Amino acid sequence: MNAMETEKQGTSGQSRIAVVTGAGSGIGRAVAVELLRAGWSVALAGRRPGTLEETAALVPGSVCLTVRTDVSRPDDVAGLFAAAVERFGRVDLLFNNAGTFGPGGVPVEELEYEAWRHVVDTNLNGAFLCAQAAYRQMKQQDPQGGRIINNGSISAHTPRPHSVAYTATKHALTGLTKSLSLDGRPYNIAVGQIDIGNAATDMTARMQTGALQANGEIAPEPVMDVADVARTVRHMAELPLEANVQFATVLATAMPYVGRG
């Protein structure tokens, strides 16, 4: 883990403070940019420092911190939150976004254990480590409290073919969200989850040319603008702490979801 501050003036010291994981690309980048444009100060976390700097450069005049972080490593996560608190003094929001689909299209009987473990370490263990670190900080800071938004998936509801590791971790993330939400109540910590379907990112680019369907066919699927996801996350983030979107589902209108199994 290492941190580098992107020095940009234009956001006051009273700005709300967010930590966004997986901020170097895709949904994480879109959400980070949306928050920065809205005046939040943001700690941008991800495995590739170069892409984090690219995210920061998209919003001139913002205040942000880039922190190289592998969320599956406890020391990296501890360092991320230490860097954020040292720079900004508190954490008001965690967008718990870092994740991986893993090896797509691999039948369960052929899935290597190491591939399974990598998905679990990133999607579930990483989400837990980040939520735990945020929870500890939000509980002890003054004023107490904050918000955690977990990035679930449509796969938290229904699977795609040959996606056992991804689907299992996203179902588990829903349990994590519910438990954190219950345990956070006494400390003014609101916890919610956004389940996203087919936002246009590098991860979903293949869906526009063809994705495996439950009937065995390969068919293209519609996608939606990732900026619409970012605006939804910002809405959830900016609610007062006495209000919480527990679960939100945002998907491309025509994608196969209802009845896809």
PLM regions with names:
Residues 105-108, 112-117:
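Substrate-binding pocket helix/loop in short-chain dehydrogenase/reductase
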Residues 24-26:
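Conserved glycine-rich cofactor-binding loop
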Residues 153:
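Residue(s) in the substrate-gating loop at a strand-loop-helix junction
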Residues 131, 169:
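Active-site helix of classical SDR
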Residues 38-54:
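Conserved glycine-rich Rossmann-like NAD(P)H-binding loop of the short-chain dehydrogenase/reductase
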Residues 68-80, 113:
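The beta1-alpha1 cofactor-binding region of Rossmann-like NAD(H)/NADP(H)-dependent oxidoreductases
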Residues 193-194, 212-259:
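C-terminal helical subdomain
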